[in-house]
């Protein structure tokens, strides 16, 4: 047993190191022009199991999956089992602004979570997952005729990359068989690079590069509770709530501007701004959920989340606030999520597809930033299935998220995407004493 725990923890350490290295290699963890603002696009929390139901999970209790969206949900498990969840995500997007169109594809490891029993109705979990992603690469040309008349044509190339990850350690316990509580310690870390290259068609002018190199870290706590009430037969009602505290970021933002001509580099500006005294922070978040469940046959749930970013400082801090002429205003983000799951007959020994779990969901999200006073909203529909594999609760989860971010109104960029998520759910029975020697 001890060796298994050591191997599992060693695997988690290697994965964390691997993620840290890949984050420094410049590969896109996600790609969207909206990630130019602040810390980029905030990743939707949850495994492939949650994402295939619109992202629900605050009131979900399912002993076959690790539901890390609510720390209290870790107690919904077999008391003798070791559990692991590993997820991958493929995103395919098409962008449109006016008559312009483009597209991009990305592939990324999304989450790795382990869970162990502690004592009777208590359990422990540890994992790593992206918190936000930056990935963009676009060009524009100068349109001001006065500037063009003086200097000639100018091309602006902007690109950025980077990720902020969260490592979390949590535990939960159930009391009176109905009321569960949980708490999580979360540590954030990551690097973000943003660069704009200004190139003059007239070679008598020097090219100018402006950019920021951001390195951040911080810690916070998250708390959750769930209350489950039996109604009639196998039907039960579950109420859930979560709260994540605001996070003061530490680290630095290196902001620079230099001009080049031939092999000559002239530094115009170079400053290092230390993040301190809470001038840049992640917003706090509160979430509530309500779910109805019919044993292991069906589950339906509605979740609402709200996060306050208005005082985050993202829209004023150097390196976070803008690239070129792009500006944004930090605001309150919201998310509405509805999802369901149905399993025809989990114990059917004749028809395999009746043992599979089928899921669907919808969501509506409002981003943590406004552009020129306009909200940036996303909406989508999700589908998914879990295919049972081998014995116990092992399974392969497949999910699809079809959605749209923003619209072409107000000269904004419309993003339509299809995201495919894959989750590997692994169970193993530990701590069970052999009946025979």
Q: Where in the sequence are the language-model features?
A:
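N-terminal, post-signal peptide beta-strand-biased segments of exported outer-membrane/organellar beta-barrel
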Residues: 22-132
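Bacterial N-terminal signal peptides
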Residues: 10-18
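Short hydrophobic "helix-edge" motifs at membrane interfaces and signal-peptide entry regions
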Residues: 10, 59-61, 167
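Bacterial N-terminal signal peptides that target proteins for export
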Residues: 1-10
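Outer-membrane beta-barrel porins/channels
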Residues: 24-52, 117, 121-437
């Amino acid at each position: 047993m001890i060796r298994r725990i050591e191997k599992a923890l060693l695997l988690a350490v290697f994965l964390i190191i691997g993620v840290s290295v890949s984050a420094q290699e410049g590969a896109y963890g996600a790609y969207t022009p909206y990630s130019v603002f602040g810390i980029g696009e905030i990743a939707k929390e949850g495994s492939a199991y949650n994402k295939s139901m619109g992202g629900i999970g605050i009131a979900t209790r399912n002993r076959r999956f690790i539901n890390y969206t609510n720390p209290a949900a870790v107690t919904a498990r077999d008391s003798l089992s070791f559990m692991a969840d590993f997820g991958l995500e493929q995103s395919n997007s098409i962008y449109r602004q006016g008559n312009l169109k483009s597209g991009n594809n990305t592939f990324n490891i999304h989450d790795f979570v382990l869970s162990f029993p502690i004592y009777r109705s208590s359990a422990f979990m540890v994992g790593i997952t992206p918190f936000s992603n930056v990935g963009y690469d676009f060009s524009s040309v100068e349109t001001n005729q006065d500037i063009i008349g003086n200097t000639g044509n100018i091309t602006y190339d902007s690109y950025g990359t980077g990720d902020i990850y969260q490592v979390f350690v949590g535990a939960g316990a159930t009391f009176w068989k109905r009321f569960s509580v949980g708490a999580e310690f979360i540590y954030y870390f990551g690097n973000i690079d943003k660069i704009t290259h200004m190139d003059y068609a007239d070679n008598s002018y020097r090219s100018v590069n402006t950019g920021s190199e951001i390195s951040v870290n911080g810690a916070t706590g998250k708390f959750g509770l769930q209350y489950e009430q039996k109604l009639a037969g196998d039907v039960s009602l579950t109420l859930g709530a979560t709260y994540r505290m605001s996070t003061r970021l530490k680290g630095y933002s290196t902001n620079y501007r230099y001009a080049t001509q031939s092999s000559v580099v002239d530094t115009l500006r170079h400053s290092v701004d230390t993040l301190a005294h809470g001038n840049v922070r992640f917003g706090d978040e509160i979430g509530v959920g309500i779910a109805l469940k019919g044993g292991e046959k069906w589950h339906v749930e509605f979740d609402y989340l709200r996060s306050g970013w208005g005082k985050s400082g993202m829209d004023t801090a150097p390196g976070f606030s803008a690239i070129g002429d792009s500006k944004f205003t930090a605001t309150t983000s919201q998310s509405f999520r509805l999802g369901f799951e149905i399993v025809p007959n989990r114990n059917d020994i004749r028809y395999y597809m009746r043992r599979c779990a089928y899921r669907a969901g919808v969501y509506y999200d409002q981003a943590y930033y406004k552009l020129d006073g306009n909200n940036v909203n996303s909406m989508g529909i999700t589908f998914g299935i879990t295919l049972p594999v081998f014995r116990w609760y092992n399974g392969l989860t497949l999910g699809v998220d079809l959605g749209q971010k923003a619209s072409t109104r107000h000269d904004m960029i419309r993003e339509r995407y299809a995201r495919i998520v894959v989750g590997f759910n692994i169970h193993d029975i530990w701590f069970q004493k052999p009946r025979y020697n």
